[in-house]
Amino acid sequence: MLGTLGLWTLLPAAAQVSPNRRTCVFFEAPGVRGSTKTLGEVVDAGPGPPKGIRCLYSHCCFGIWNLTHGRAQVEMQGCLDSDEPGCESLHCDPVPRAHPSPSSTLFTCSCGTDFCNANYSHLPPSGNRGAPGPQEPQATPGGPIWMAQLLLGVFLVLLLSIIILALLQRKACRVQGGSDPEPEPGSGGDCSEELPELAELRFSQVIQEGGHAVVWAGRLQGEMVAIKAFPPRAVAQFRAERAVYQLLGLQHNHIVRFITAGQGGPGPLPSGPLLVLELYPKGSLCHYLTQYTSDWGSSLRMALSLAEGLAFLHGERWQDGQYKPGIAHRDLSSQNVLIREDRSCAIGDLGLALVLPGLAQPPALAPTQPRGPAAILEAGTQRYMAPELLDKTLDLQDWGTALQRADVYSLALLLWEILSRCSDLRPDHRPPPFQLAYEAELGSNPSACELWALAVAERKRPNIPSSWSCSATDPRGLRELLEDCWDADPEARLTAECVQQRLAALAYPQVASSFPESCPQGCPENCPAAPASAAFPCRPQQSSCLLSVQQGSGSKS
């Protein structure tokens, strides 16, 4: 019997892991076809092993070993694509699965603790497990035994390849947030769906690189467009985002415009799934605020359009016979908001968006909803996460409303960033250089623990200068608005619609007072955090409250 074999001493770089993501040892022997690397994020500790991998789809590690003549050879280690029986084990307990040759046995294990697949124990000897018998004949090159072992070796490689390909196929078919392959609306239920080839699409230059996609500037039929190119391994992320963009009625001035979806690639690179979207040459909100300051009119336009876009996303409505469900964005950040030519905002990057449960929702939209607490609690950029996401106390009983409230917290941080670059809110009309929310307190790359300590334990928020409450523009409601949006109690926060109302009242105080039925004082006091009802008619009419702000000016910083 073999004792416990420690394969590697895990490096510190691999040990610094997220408390909510399983981290496993990652290894694939040379010659193994396919890879399970796409089931997680590889932690590269150097030019060679050891490496770790943070699992994306499960909390389960696995290992595959080949025991030949009493000697163990590692074939594969990594993440499984789902939590399966055996994942509850704290240790790697190998189980024999196949006998590629009389003297060789293939063992596998699964376990559910960090790096548990680094060590394996109690591997029984391979081959004959009975009493000692006659010595095995030696394999002579070219002889029948040698040929049999060669064929069995080839069989072993093919078997491992089939296992890997099966894992990858399951992962590719997975709808984001779910545990089983299910069709998305309009997909026809076919995992191997053929996407149209976008032959007329031309790629120009890379404008942004992310974890699952690269965004290019390009042209389609003469129109300048943005191309979000996904690698073939990220088909699940592509399908999830496309499903949200293709929902009936999801067309709005302050939501990034979806044009089409298909497949293609720049030049010699492999063809992959693509989303073609409207191009916004002014770039992201973060980029714009870094480069420019704005006057009061421009700042209000950005703030009001951002709130209007989020209110539209959150709203459930029927319009012209078409149904639009409520949608939670879950990844609002100044990188995911784009600036239009008129300096208003358009919300983009719907890769983590979730369709919310609604009273009139058609059954066909069910696959776009999560199927478990882990999928609901998954969120985007840490800096903008609501306190209830940082400490995992989000209300899972009414998760739809809870996610909307979390979005409003993120909205408040974006409003603060916009207002921090407003020249009219400073006595000298010279705002300081742009900083992200919490950058002054925690720096440019805060950890989840640092954010938890500041935003949850200490209940601190970005500083609101006193000049914001006594400037010539008289924005008396700014401090109250922000505090009502980033309140530590999610139930005390405003809805996105009410934020829209209050900003409209700041932009047009005379308009808000002229329409008491549709705009009750811009909802300064009585707008509930829960969705509007007959008792709280805080639902503006497009023709009265939501007039466009006249275009202001932006000053180069």
Curated annotation (Swiss-Prot):
The chain crosses the membrane at residues 145-165. Its EC number is 2.7.11.30. SUPFAM superfamilies: Protein kinase-like (PK-like), Snake toxin-like. It is found in: Membrane. It comes from the Eukaryota. It is a single-pass type I membrane protein. Keywords: ATP-binding, Disulfide bond, Glycoprotein, Kinase, Magnesium, Manganese, Membrane, Metal-binding, Nucleotide-binding, Receptor, Serine/threonine-protein kinase, Signal, Transferase, Transmembrane, Transmembrane helix. Belongs to the protein kinase superfamily. TKL Ser/Thr protein kinase family. TGFB receptor subfamily. Interacts with type I receptor ACVR1. This is Anti-Muellerian hormone type-2 receptor.
